[in-house]
Amino acid sequence: MSWLTAEEALRALKTKPQTLYANVSRGRIRAKPDPADPRRSLYQAADVQRLAERHAGRRKTETVAAEAIRWGDPVLSSAISTIIGGRLFYRGKDAAGFAEVAMLEQTAALLWNGAEQLSCSAGAGHASPSLQAAFLALAGRVTSDLPSLGRSQAALRREASGVLHTVADALAPGSSDRPLHLRLAASWQRPDAADCLRRALVLLADHELNASAFAARVTASAGAALSAVVLSGLATLTGPLHGAAWQGVDALIDTASALGAEQAIRRTLAQGNRLSAFGHPLYPDGDVRALALLSQFHLPPQFAEVREVGEEMVGEKVNVDFALAAMCAAFDLPREAPIIIFSLARSVGWLAHAMEQIDSGELIRPRARYTGPAPETDNRE
């Protein structure tokens, strides 16, 4: 595998340094520190060549848009979060560093761009964390909440706080005078998990323009209520290729428990199934969120074996879906705990994206390329 210096990559691409860095952050060009000078980076030659060849030909706008919306290329502007050089940033702050000390409430204040730190909810909550309760509570608000269109950012931030409290009362029930991570720990009767829950909530609060964030922005762009925005994001998150990827991790662990890690991974790959536990296109050198979380607890033996064997066989490091499932297993949390944690955390990000999209004043309305039967012609004389 050959590598290029920044100067060589820029000459090949005929572009600016900012564009090179953006391509790295989107996972389109792999980069690594220069062994001769760790302050500099080297760029994967094959990735650079592929992009250079792509840009050499003039492509139709519709082709560019179709490729962008599938994966990888920026399709809209956002100041909320980004991934650059294998690091996740929240409004310019390193998310892993921020997670060392911050709570989800402080993360909301940061991502919502000027909001005061959220106070604790006064809701009564439910007996235990429930995703179904969150769906029902949000749906109940949608028909009565005001549309977001035509309202100030200050008014929207106040409503966002209320919507988050609605979600929290369903997903993190309990005493209302405590931070959300403590409420979760108490509802599951696992006080020793509190700090890891805090870190996970912060690390999962936003992740640039992922599938659920895009769904949330589309909903917000139509002027829908913020509760509708979170409802659409939550529905998207439940997909197995997004927030429910932990189920694939659990299935792999179950198979590994019966067959051993190597055979479990071989069987999964032989069946043509993706391994939810490994790799992320935006983190060619490893998911920084996983690294930040895995350093805080001891991996259960089966997870440790799958990690060791899988990273060698697959050639990819474990991702945040693996880390979240492992954390929940390490603290003996309920089986649905990963999606509960993910949903509560990401609600903060969806609301941030909603307010940013509303502020732009733009309706997201792409066109479809028709591939159906030829339209009928009018043969009348």
Predicted segments, located by residue:
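Hydrophobic alpha-helical bundle cores within soluble ligand-binding/oligomerization subdomains
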Residues: 2-381
